[in-house]
Structures are given as structure tokens and as C-alpha cells.
Amino acid sequence: MDALSSNRRQFLKFLGTAAVIGTVAPDTLAVDQAKATSLTILHTNDVHSRLDPFPMDGGRNAGKGGIARRATLIKQIRQEQKNVLLFDAGDVFQGTPYFNLYKGEPEVLAMNRLGYDAGTIGNHDFDGGIDNMVTQFGKASWPLLIANYDFKNTVMDGRTKPYRIFEKEGIRVGVFGLGIQPEGLIPKDAYKETKYLDPIEVGNDTAAKLRSEQHCDYVICLSHLGFKYDDATVSDNVLAAKTRNIDLIIGGHTHTFLDAPVAVNNPDGQPVWINQVGFAGINLGRIDLTFEQGKAISSTGKSVEVK
């Protein structure tokens, strides 16, 4: 808890510009404020087909979550904020009878209604088989981003993108996806000839392309690698420490509850912020950024309970 509190304080003071701007002359302040652009990032992970709130059974999650409440919360934030992006970090499928009966269709259609901007692939999204992924994700109104799965020899070929660029008031946000190693985790007959590519190498290459070639001001990775492990398995923490040009990792897979994003320095000593908000749609991640002249000058983040 102390570590989380420390990271929260770090995050709230990210680049500290907002704290010193009050010392600037009034005329300069007015000019700076005119240039400032705000952007709110909302995100979910590991919703696992939880369309309804948890039942009122006395459990620790009783009454929490539910797609209707999430929709209301997202709508409220969009009414309050001009520039909003909404992402998911994978494992949309599996976990309730909705998936058993309908194989993911209600989940995808619900995300369409909520206006998701993009998502990535989790291991449980293969649970109905790769043919089912084609059927269900083919109904999505949002792009499925995955840079380190090569689907060339499968029916998913051409149905995903490695990255997508979003522009909000001149701010270019590059977003890409990374998935977990399927071997040993997903049945072979579910992912078939999908090839897994090294997430560190792909992450470095994709982030560099977004930053240098696509001139993105902010780079986000939607990751289903998992937050952190006790061994050398590639996780979000490892990804942050071994890559450059990534500003924010929105994670999934390990169902990690973070009160606020945590920072891991990259090889250049720059902080990479990592966030994950548990599972089942209990929480909605929220990160508020302020940009001036194409650079993020301040940032706050939190986990918002859906209730």
C-alpha cells in the first residue's frame, strides 16, 4: 500500500508543470492556457463477459460493476470532458453464462454501444476458437489492435491492426496492442497457426515508428502481458523497463487492482506509467492529461469504482 501511495504521489506530480505555472506572469499564463489541450483516457481490462452487476450475495463484489452502470459513468465523463478515448486491454470473453450461450456477441455489441475506441486481445478471447473470434470481433465497430500476433496463416489474417492513431485537437495519440504468449496457456486448436512475436522487440519497433515516423505526441500500449511476475516472464513492468517511446501501458491479464498508475523508468530514465483496474468491470480506469505544444505537462490517474 505504501508503494502504491508513493507512486500515486509521483503520478500526481508528473513533470510538475502545473505546480509552477502559478508563478508565471498573468499575460503569459493566459497564452499558455490558450495552448493547453486536455485529454481523458478511460480503460477497462478482463471484463470477462460480466454484463450484469455482481449479485447481492454478501460477497466482496456484491452489487458492483455492470455494463449499464459503466455506460452511465462513461457518458457522464464525456459530458464533462471534451476529448475522451476509451480502450480495453483484453479478455472481453469468458466468465459468465453470456459467453457460454452467445460466444461473445453481447459483449462486443455492448462495447459498440459504449463507444470504445480500440481494444486488444486477451488469452480468453480465444476460448471459443479462432473462428469464433472472426465471427464476434467482426461485429466490432472499434479496431482490434495487436502488434505481436502474426495471423497470416489463419482466418484472422487481415482482421486486426498493429496500431491506430487518434487525433484530438491536434494531439496525436498512437495506440498499439501486445498479447501474451499463447503456447502453454491457450489450447493449440484454439489459436492454430498464430505466431507469437517477441513483445519487447515488437514494442520497441512499434513505439519508435509511432513516435518518429507517425509523429505521435503520446504513445499508449494496450497490453495483455500481465502486470508483474516473480520470474523473468515478460510483463508490463519488464516491457516498460526494456523499451523506449512508450508513455503509458494499459494492462490486463493478472487482474491487478491499482489505485493509481505506477511508474517504471525506461532505459533513458523516463517514467513509463502502468495502470490496471482489476477485473469484471468493477472499476473504470481514468487518466487525465494536459498537453502544451504537443507535450504532456501534467497528469493525474485513478481507478473509479463502477457502482
Regions found by a protein language model. Give the residues of each.
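Acidic, metal/ion-coordinating pockets
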Residues: 2-306
